[in-house]
């Protein structure tokens, strides 16, 4: 039986109603109590390393998640990260590169509704994440609404619907329905990595993201040059010389 660690970070999945609206309050043991049926599929334990609204996620906290996985890498067969949806895709992409060549599965999930809500998607999403972590396929994934998405290609596209995430420029890796996994045979991944030499839980936050638009003032690049180590350009897909000009 596989040994899986749930790493709780907060988010809607751990929220409860208060006078100030939804606030992260449920601890990791409470999350585990909502999916008792999973106990027959694996040995599941949990740890809470933060309890935040994911809009407050930042590179340092992302590194804390990676460091936690590195700390427990020899004790568990797979990892599930409970996370808020607003910044889940950022954390997933960051973990893909910080955990490069990591030989165990890391599955990130969350929900559109709190675990305690009547029609919550939290129970299914968390269950699906654990089920896929038990598969033992190395890599970082997002589990949401029955879809398993490569962590580097997940993007939130809806704010209210259960199918909040899509896979961008890459096929969905697998689907889960009634606890059964259907793998996408078109996806050929390196699922059998054998070492952890690629774990580097470090990020450089001195990077600016700029969305190019017609008429952008080039002075902004002079500012970036003096204050940042790098710049990512969000530009049109064509023509290619648009960004170069």
Sequence positions of predicted segments:
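Accessory alpha-helical/coil subdomains and C-terminal extensions
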Residues: 7-8, 34-35, 152-230
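Short beta-strand segments
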Residues: 7-9, 81-83, 107-110, 141-146, ...
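ATP/NTP phosphate-donor binding region
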Residues: 1-70
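Short acidic, glycine-rich surface-loop motifs adjacent to enzyme active sites
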Residues: 76-88, 227-236
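Gly/Ser/Thr-rich loops at beta-strand to alpha-helix junctions
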Residues: 11-13, 84-89, 147-149, 240
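Short Gly/Thr/Asp-enriched flexible loops that form oxyanion-binding sites at enzyme active sites
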Residues: 82-103
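Single conserved hydrophobic/aromatic residue that forms the stacking wall/gate
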Residues: 234-244
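Internal gly/pro-rich beta-alpha loop/helix module
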Residues: 109-176
């Amino acid at each position: 039986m596989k040994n899986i660690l749930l790493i709780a970070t907060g988010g809607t999945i751990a929220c409860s109603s208060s006078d100030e609206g939804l606030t992260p309050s449920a601890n990791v043991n409470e999350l585990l109590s909502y999916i008792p049926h999973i106990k027959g599929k694996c040995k599941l334990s949990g740890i809470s390393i933060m309890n935040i609204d994911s809009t407050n996620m930042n590179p340092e906290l992302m590194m804390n998640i990676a460091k936690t996985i590195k700390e427990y890498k020899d004790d568990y067969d797979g990892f599930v990260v409970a996370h808020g949806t607003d910044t889940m895709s950022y954390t997933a992409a960051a973990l893909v590169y910080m955990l490069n060549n990591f030989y165990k599965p890391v599955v990130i999930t969350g929900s559109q509704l709190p675990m305690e809500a009547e029609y919550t998607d939290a129970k299914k999403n968390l269950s699906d994440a654990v089920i896929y972590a038990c598969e033992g396929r190395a890599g970082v994934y997002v589990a949401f609404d029955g879809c398993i998405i490569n962590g580097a290609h997940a993007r939130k596209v809806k704010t209210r619907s259960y199918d909040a995430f899509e896979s961008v420029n890459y096929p969905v890796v697998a689907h889960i329905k009634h606890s059964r996994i259907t793998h996408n045979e078109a996806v050929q991944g390196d699922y059998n990595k054998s070492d952890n030499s690629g774990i580097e839980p470090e990020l450089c936050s001195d990077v600016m993201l700029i969305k190019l638009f017609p008429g952008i003032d080039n002075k902004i690049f002079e500012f970036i040059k003096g204050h940042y180590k790098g710049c990512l350009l969000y530009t049109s897909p064509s023509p290619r010389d648009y960004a170069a000009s």
